[in-house]
Design a protein with these regions (language model features):
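P-loop NTPase motor domains
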Residues: 1-280
Length: 281
């Protein structure tokens, strides 16, 4: 909560915790303190700072899609649902559900064409919804068509309402150059440098710590980015085996630090995870 006591507690945790940490670091204090600890050899684990204002590490939104396999649709839906949230008090969830379906279909379609996440979002922003649906129905895979087939048959006014919902939530990814750079797949990533995904962070006992640094004055603007990343992290943690199962018995503990948590606003995925993740270590 930003008080002196909480700051001391969090910093002392950074000094003593020996397993992987992911920290939301609004003010940048935690990453600076950890850098000092590392320089003074008080800790040994390397670390990553994800900061769209000063891009050093890139985040790969599509890391799990590249695995393919039976969970491909689940991974697509996690991205779409994180970008387009559905408030618990929404009166007409139909339009949000359709917007999620449209974005899911577009993700599948453009991913299969070889576009990365930002490339997909740019195409969604630039293409009229009726034209996008028609293109996916005519040229997309069976999976992509399944997501948009109902939308393609709606009246133009209804399609426009769905498209407005999609474009409103994806606008920041298409217009903010810092976000585009932070979430784009670039040449350095091809060699395995500069890009990270939660799968490696969660599953590898030797993974680096990660500090998500988004300055307080950009929280409202970049809230969708943080929600996407945190949702993908929580879902990856939920896939860890139960800590008392044979597979989870040797699983190292994982620490998620939510510094300045109230500043993030309401994030249902975090609140729901408070109970589900206790058994995941």
């Amino acid at each position: 909560n930003g008080s002196g006591k909480s700051s001391i507690l969090v910093k002392s945790t950074l000094e003593t915790w020996r397993d992987v940490i992911v920290a939301i670091d609004i003010k940048g204090e935690l990453s600076r303190h950890y850098q000092w600890l590392l320089q003074n050899r008080l800790v040994q684990r390397p670390y990553i700072v994800f900061n769209p204002s000063n891009v050093g590490s890139h985040y790969d939104v599509y890391a799990l899609l590249k695995k393919g396999g039976p969970n491909f649709v689940q991974y697509v839906r996690e991205i779409a649902c994180a970008i387009i949230p559905k408030p618990s008090d929404v009166r007409e969830p139909y339009w949000i559900d359709m917007a999620r379906d449209l974005l899911s279909g577009a993700i599948v379609y453009y991913y299969e064409l070889g576009l990365d996440f930002i490339g997909t979002i740019l195409m969604v922003q630039d293409t009229p919804i009726a034209e996008l649906c028609k293109e996916i129905v005519q040229e997309g895979s069976d999976l992509a068509r399944m997501f948009v087939s109902e939308i393609a048959g709606l009246k133009q006014q209804q399609q426009s309402a769905i498209g407005t919902e999609v474009k409103r939530h994806t606008m920041v990814f298409a217009t903010d150059p810092d976000i585009q750079s932070a979430l784009s797949f670039n040449k350095s990533d091809e060699d395995g440098f500069g890009a990270f995904s939660w799968e490696g962070i969660v599953s590898d006992a030797d993974a680096p710590n990660v500090f998500l640094c988004i300055s307080q004055d950009r929280l409202e603007q970049w809230g969708g980015v943080l929600r996407l990343m945190i949702t993908q992290l929580i879902r990856q943690l939920e896939r860890r085996p139960e800590k008392y199962s044979p597979q989870g018995r040797d699983m190292k503990p994982f620490l998620l630090l939510l510094d300045e948590f109230p500043l993030l606003g309401k994030m249902d995925v975090i609140q729901n995870a408070m109970t589900t993740l206790r058994s995941k270590n």
